[in-house]
């Protein structure tokens, strides 16, 4: 059978919160089969556990924020994206602040952390959510859709009218049956515009943002000294975000995701719309590994890629 996965040993790192600018200690621990991914605010007088779920996402203006009983864990999408890319089903995530550290603005640091801990299979079948019919949400000219597809592929179109973005490509599609998440998506960094960063700082946000953890653009060009990691890094990062946003549903999706100018909020609305229609999806497991979609086979999601 295609089995669930967790990590082999505890691992921790320290980083900076993107919005608070404060030091954050992140600890990842193995979790038993069937646990799912559970975030815990260990800095509160009484620790609050927040299991990932589409319904647990509250604020989505600047990031995906898990909320429960007044406790928040912000900016979970890059870590969730890494977990999806490596096929991690069960994990305890302990954090001593209200946001996950931004690291270098991509998912690469989290991939490294998870791989350093070691990834092991558990004696329980991996459960998938298989999309059975199209589900779509719109907001003005923004769109996010899930369609039936025996695998996992994504297509994303952005529309940032900026010289640096225009020349890199505004649309990107990827099918994980024949493409490595670690190589092709994980290293794509978040990006923002200098005038937006200043506005956020005036609101007491983005205090941890810098050229070390984001691609920053002025009106004409990229301010970072280094080159882009991918020719089309901007749209690839939107795919990275979408993978993380979708993974908060609690299981890997078997289906195709199509988006135009979508963001954290619309991605979460899409999950809620899917779950609200019981005829739109089903839970499936695979007793025989070879019957599973190629995107989820061990060779497509190796513990070390």
From Swiss-Prot:
Enzyme Commission identifier(s) = 3.5.1.108
Signal peptide annotation: none
Keywords of the record: Hydrolase, Lipid A biosynthesis, Lipid biosynthesis, Lipid metabolism, Metal-binding, Zinc
Positions annotated to bind Zn(2+): 78, 237, 241
Indicate whether Magnesium appears among the record's keywords: no
GO terms of biological process kind: lipid A biosynthetic process
Enzyme group, top EC level?
hydrolase
| Metabolic or biological pathway, per its Swiss-Prot or TrEMBL entry | Glycolipid biosynthesis; lipid IV(A) biosynthesis; lipid IV(A) from (3R)-3-hydroxytetradecanoyl-[acyl-carrier-protein] and UDP-N-acetyl-alpha-D-glucosamine: step 2/6
Q: Could you tell me which InterPro entries the record lists for this protein?
A: Ribosomal_Su5_D2-typ_SF (IPR020568), UDP-acyl_GlcNac_deAcase (IPR004463), UDP-acyl_GlcNac_deAcase_C (IPR011334), UDP-acyl_N-AcGlcN_deAcase_N (IPR015870)
Q: Which cofactor does it need?
A: Zn(2+)
One of the record's GO cellular component terms: membrane
Q: HAMAP family given for it?
A: LpxC
Q: Which family does it belong to?
A: Belongs to the LpxC family.
Database matches in PANTHER family? UDP-3-O-ACYL-N-ACETYLGLUCOSAMINE DEACETYLASE 1, MITOCHONDRIAL-RELATED
- Function of this protein? Catalyzes the hydrolysis of UDP-3-O-myristoyl-N-acetylglucosamine to form UDP-3-O-myristoylglucosamine and acetate, the committed step in lipid A biosynthesis.
What is this protein's record name?
UDP-3-O-acyl-N-acetylglucosamine deacetylase
Q: Name the encoding gene, please.
A: lpxC
């Amino acid at each position: 059978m295609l089995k669930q996965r967790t990590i082999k040993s505890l691992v921790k790192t320290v980083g900076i919160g993107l919005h608070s600018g404060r030091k954050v200690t992140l600890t990842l621990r193995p979790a038993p089969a069937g646990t799912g991914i559970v975030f815990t605010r260990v800095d509160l007088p009484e620790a609050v556990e927040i299991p990932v779920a589409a319904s647990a996402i509250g604020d989505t203006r600047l990031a995906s924020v898990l909320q429960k009983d007044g406790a928040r864990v912000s900016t979970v999408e890059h870590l969730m994206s890494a977990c999806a890319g490596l096929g991690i089903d069960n994990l305890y995530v302990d954090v001593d602040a209200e946001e996950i550290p931004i690291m270098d603005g991509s998912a690469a640091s989290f991939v490294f952390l998870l791989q350093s801990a070691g990834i092991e299979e558990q004696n329980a079948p991996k459960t998938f959510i298989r999309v059975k019919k199209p589900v779509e949400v719109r907001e003005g000219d923004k769109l996010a859709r899930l369609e039936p597809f025996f695998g996992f592929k994504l297509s994303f179109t952005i529309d940032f009218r900026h010289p640096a973005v225009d020349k890199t490509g505004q649309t990107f599609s990827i099918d994980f049956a024949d493409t490595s998440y670690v190589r092709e998506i994980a290293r794509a960094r978040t990006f923002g515009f200098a005038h937006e960063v200043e506005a956020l700082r005036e609101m007491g946000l983005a205090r941890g943002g810098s050229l070390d953890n984001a691609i920053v653009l002025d009106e004409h060009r990229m301010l970072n000294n280094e080159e882009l990691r991918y020719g089309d890094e901007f749209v690839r990062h939107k795919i990275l975000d979408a993978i993380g946003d979708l993974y908060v549903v609690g299981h890997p999706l078997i289906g195709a995701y199509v988006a135009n100018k979508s963001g954290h909020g619309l991605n979460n609305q899409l999950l809620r719309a899917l779950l609200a229609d019981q005829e739109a999806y089903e839970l499936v497991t695979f007793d025989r590994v070879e019957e599973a979609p190629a995107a989820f086979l061990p060779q497509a999601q190796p513990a070390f890629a």
